[in-house]
Amino acid sequence: MAGSGNDRVPAPSFNPWTAAYEYAVDAWQRGVLYADVMRQRGNQYHDHMAKRAPNVLSMEYELVLDGRELPRPVNYGLLRIKPPEGVTVDPIKRPFLVVDPRAGHGPGIGGFKPEGEMGVAVGAGHSPHFATFLPQPVPTQTVEDVMKAEAHFLEEIIARHPDAEGKPVVVANCQAGWQIMMTAAVRPELFGPIIIAGAPLSYWAGWRGMNPMRYAGGLLGGSWLTALTSDLGDGKFDGAWLVQNFENLNPANTLWSKQYNLYSKVDTEAGRYLSFEKWWGGHVFLNGPEIQYIVDNLFVGNRLSTAGLVTSDGIRIDLRNIRSPVVVFCSKGDNITPPPQTLGWIPDLYQDDAEVLAHDQTIVYAVHESIGHLGIFVSGSVARKEHQEFTSNIEMIDVLPPGIYQAEIADKTPDTP
């Protein structure tokens, strides 16, 4: 039998003193837990950087080549990733090489999550390899030396996979993208399909009034600041300055949003926060001549997308010499490397489609609508969708006739065949 309207349970009375007390206790507890996470972050940093070769890879690995032992030594190394228990690789399938950016942070973000770029390659049965690097550079190493080391790594991978059906697939993120493209332009015979994610290649390109990183470079007046910083560092450039550039793009997130997100979810967020901060705070160094070469020739000089770079051996670095299919993955939400910078090299080098065909070049590009710069190669959802599609269709991409193709990757629906 329904009760009358007078049978309602009365609402509890509001006591401001009780509410204030409960709020104060909650804030105190959150503050203590937040401070403890900060303590863990500091200890984690010291433990991480004390390692001989710190990285954030989620899979076990073994060292195959030490770049310090090459004829022109560098601080890079080639790792063979050990597949997880229960996963087998197919010796017939192309091996994969994932190369992470040396742009302030340490290595491993390409294999940071089990479902990331590395995990996708392993899950598809490919033999995975990773190009890592140490926090400190070899005193004499140059950008060209790193290119030669990458070529050595690919030669070693090819030698170890004589039954593979093709040359290695190379996945290069951010800074590693332009460096791998330079290597491929000089040694095209070593490369299978190349996937570059969030990699700047045309440095003057961009949308008017957008992407403040471009404007910051112009306002600071050229490369004098990197030269000064390297001098102050006794010939080394601290990668923490590059990370600071990331932070300065969104001070509200740096100073408030990221910290408040941890504070408000401190019971559940600590693990994710600490795992990301291990990579975000693990800074590395570059030699002064390395960063000066990068700034003068690429970001200020824009000589890569105009075939204006010449090696010390007299070889012109012309991206039109690349014989492998190039997959370019970028995002409209990337304010570090917006689509004009990732794709602008194509109109810089080719007047029309006929020139692309004449150079026998295959270019596939995909533009995400919203993901940020790091999400292009860190996000689990992007790995499960875009990177999964690139990997599973890599053989089809390899046999595409020359030309420029746009890849549109959509979610499956009930009507999808």
Each language-model region and where it sits:
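Alpha/beta-hydrolase-fold serine-hydrolase catalytic core, especially in secreted/extracellular enzymes
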Residues: M1-P16, G106, L134, F299-I317, ...
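Alpha/beta-hydrolase-fold enzymes
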Residues: M1-R39, E165, I180-Q292, P401-Y405, ...
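Short, surface-exposed "cap/lid" segments of acyl-processing enzymes
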Residues: A50-P137
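The conserved beta1-alpha1 loop
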Residues: L97-P101, C174, C330-S331
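Alpha/beta-hydrolase active-site loop
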Residues: Q141-R160
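Short beta-strand immediately N-terminal to the catalytic nucleophile in serine-hydrolase-like folds
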Residues: V170-A172, A197, F329
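Gly/Ala-rich beta-loop-alpha elbow adjacent to hydrolase catalytic centers
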Residues: V171-I180
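Short beta-strand/loop motif that positions the catalytic acidic residue
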Residues: I322, V328-C330, D334
